[in-house]
Amino acid sequence: MLKKLDSLLTVAGITLPDQQKHQLIGYVELLDKWNKAYNLTSVRDPQQMLVRHILDSIVVNPHLQGSRFIDVGTGPGLPGIPLAIVRPDAHFTLLDSLGKRVRFLRQVQHELGLNNIEPVQSRVEAFTSEPPFDGVISRAFASLQDMLSWCHHLPAKPEGRFYALKGVRPDDELAVLPEDIVLESVIKLDVPELDGERHLIILKSN
């Protein structure tokens, strides 16, 4: 699996220290093991997890600004855990409403020694944080409107950002953004061996 990860990283132009590579593989191994009982992801093949979960998450890293992030609707820790592994200088709160997912996240935290994550079981609308976050990250929401309405209280004003991971560029959604939200950028992400498009939408309060 290390060989596969190395080849994907090379194609993506990403260089990581060995410790981070081993943590990423350790995460895939835990996800594969727990998935059989907990049904955490529809991706069953660990080699595919490297593409669709690991690379798909860490390509976002260069575009994140700040040091305190929350991954909303993180599920089994995506994109939060891969990002936390490659950004040990930043802190990631991993929010999910399902207890079995949060139990898995705590196990990952323990086994991989990740001191920069905090798994939290909560519904997003009931969760508050002081101080607020530099960035709100999610690939879980069906629409940008849902993300903005559920998470409006989480980023610091005015400099905090929303980072939405989407497939095809959501032009219909971008055309109807609320008046108090400004589109900062739409970034086409290149994920090696991934079928379909990936875009990162970065939004700010104005």
From Swiss-Prot:
Protein origin, superkingdom: Bacteria
Subcellular location(s) of the protein: Cytoplasm
GO MF term set: rRNA (guanine-N7-)-methyltransferase activity
Principal place of residence: cytoplasm
Top-level class of the enzyme under EC nomenclature: transferase
GO CC terms in record: cytosol
Reaction(s) this enzyme catalyzes, per UniProt: guanosine(527) in 16S rRNA + S-adenosyl-L-methionine = N(7)-methylguanosine(527) in 16S rRNA + S-adenosyl-L-homocysteine
Keyword Iron: no
SUPFAM superfamilies linked to this entry: S-adenosyl-L-methionine-dependent methyltransferases (SSF53335)
Disulphide connectivity of cysteines: none
Family from the record: Belongs to the methyltransferase superfamily. RNA methyltransferase RsmG family.
Role: Specifically methylates the N7 position of guanine in position 527 of 16S rRNA.
Protein name (database record): Ribosomal RNA small subunit methyltransferase G
Gene source species: Yersinia pestis
